[in-house]
């Protein structure tokens, strides 16, 4: 057993870039029967971030599960990022996480202390979220993987969906894009330690703070931007809402260096899976470069919240969230349904 093996050397795809592509996933899930239960408010038949089940007239439980291979070599940081990513689904649905269970796959070639560090990173993020870890499950596996099964609670009227955007709303993104590209560059040892720290800081930041900034505001629709990229998750929102979302390319926050690496072809495999599914679902202006398109489809790991809300409410949200992040901004608007669900200008 070794402490010197790089975690990312044991993976082909890392973070949310390891997700099965949206096209394949949709074809599988659409063929499965749907469960009928009057208390199941949100199930897998929609593209929402978690399921929602009614406990009583005052309480719903939000359930989600998320795990993936490492995108960084430091085990503690990997644990933090994986936990932040799993917790995010509850925030995106308007709830607060309460209890979590560890899911860990661990290879015999690694020293057991590395597992302990991964779990410690997850524990600290769950504690920051105000939730508890109550157990978990382990599997021996040549490829390390970690994540959480999370349960959260909310009042029925607090639940947010990704399918209720209104014409005239503006779209806000709370974290910068380019995470998948930068992780791919890091695996190829093309970026320095300071840039790695910047990217991991973005990934490990809880969406708890963005969610808290929505309290009392009229949020029409919400999701988080993860493995299907900005265009993929915007498409889910536009399609579910029966609207078109126009994205302002010049307003999108992008990690410094991501466009350069995309131009060099340093992009994760998951981007091609996303493009294969999304290629006929968006239109781009003549001024949109190929590398920018790549960034917009880049699989994000523990990305930001994507919010649809009235412009006046958006200004209040941005004034609140500037205390937590410099990245949040208006990146688009919701239009009546047009020829394409997504338009990039």
UniProtKB/Swiss-Prot annotation:
The record marks 19 as: Important for catalytic activity. Mg(2+) binds at residues 49, 89, 224. CDD domains: SelD. The active site is at 16. Belongs to the selenophosphate synthase 1 family. Class I subfamily. Its cofactor is Mg(2+). GO terms for molecular function: ATP binding; magnesium ion binding; selenide, water dikinase activity. PANTHER family: INACTIVE SELENIDE, WATER DIKINASE-LIKE PROTEIN-RELATED (PTHR10256:SF0), SELENIDE, WATER DIKINASE (PTHR10256). Keywords: ATP-binding, Kinase, Magnesium, Metal-binding, Nucleotide-binding, Selenium, Transferase. InterPro entries: PurM-like_C_dom (IPR010918), PurM-like_C_sf (IPR036676), PurM-like_N (IPR016188), PurM-like_N_sf (IPR036921), SelD_I (IPR023061), SPS/SelD (IPR004536). The keyword Cell inner membrane does not apply. Pfam families: AIRS, AIRS_C. One of its GO terms (cellular component) is cytoplasm. This is Selenide, water dikinase. It catalyses: hydrogenselenide + ATP + H2O = selenophosphate + AMP + phosphate + 2 H(+). GO terms for biological process: selenocysteine biosynthetic process. Its EC number is 2.7.9.3. Homodimer.
